[in-house]
Structures are given as structure tokens and as C-alpha cells.
Amino acid sequence: MRHYETMFILKPTLVEEEIKSKIEFYREVITKHHGVIETSLDMGMRNLAYEIKKHKRGYYYVAYFKAEPSMIVELERLYRINEDVLRFIVIKYESKKEVEAWHALVDRANKKPSHAKEKHEKTEHTHSHHAEEAESVGSHSE
């Protein structure tokens, strides 16, 4: 499975129930095609950078997920045919560096420390532990 991020913007004229229904629909598209949603951000109603289809605002939603590449074609097709979707994007994270960035974004969305920070903390702890051992060995030999 590959790592992806998707964001879509819904029309501001939708009522809360319709927004929830659209979000759930796209989440189900991912999971029904054996995708795994790691986390999501419901960003709410925001001003658009520029007018889209006569709208100055839109409802933003972002999801970070893992899926097979074949599922992306269907997801994008469903975005395109839905008149309530003003804009969408699907970003694929491929290289090791990109996947690490994807994990950092997921961790930030979940309010967890990033994987890179955890690795640094573990390394730091290991180095300080080895230093303590060396110090205690040195003091016993005196």
C-alpha cells in the first residue's frame, strides 16, 4: 500500500448533515477499497483564496491514508462527478523522505511527537545511558 493525502472543498451552501454525509461517503470509498485512513482533519468553513464556481468560501476536509494505487482513480472519478465538490487534490508520497514527511503530518494531525523526534529521543537516551555505564565502570576501576 502507498501513502496518500487527500483534501477536498465542499460548497458552503450545504447544511451540516449533507457535509457529514459527503465526508462519510468519501471515507467509505477509501475503506471499501481496502484503504486505511490513518487520520483526518475536519478544517471547517474557510475563505477561498479565489472565487470558485461563484463561491468565496468552502468546507475543507483532509485525510491521510494508505491504499492501493488502483483505488485513487475511482476516488478522483467520484470527486469529479460530485457537483458539491468545488476542488480536490490527492497527493502520493513515494520516496523514503516523502513517507517520513507523511508520518510527521499524521503525527501532527494526531498531536503526537513526530517519528523523527522519537528516534532522536531514543538515540539521545541510548547515548546518555552508555555514558552513564562508562562512567560507572570507570569509577569502579579506581
Swiss-Prot record:
It comes from the Bacteria. Keywords: Ribonucleoprotein, Ribosomal protein, RNA-binding, rRNA-binding. GO terms for molecular function: small ribosomal subunit rRNA binding; structural constituent of ribosome. GO terms for biological process: translation. Residues 110-133 have a biased composition (Basic and acidic residues). Pfam families: Ribosomal_S6. Residues 110-142 are annotated as: Disordered. GO terms for cellular component: cytosolic small ribosomal subunit. InterPro entries: Ribosomal_bS6, Ribosomal_bS6_CS, Ribosomal_bS6_sf, Ribosomal_S6_plastid/chlpt, Transl_elong_EF1B/ribsomal_bS6. PANTHER family: MITOCHONDRIAL 28S RIBOSOMAL PROTEIN S6, SMALL RIBOSOMAL SUBUNIT PROTEIN BS6M. Binds together with bS18 to 16S ribosomal RNA. Belongs to the bacterial ribosomal protein bS6 family. This is Small ribosomal subunit protein bS6. The gene is rpsF.
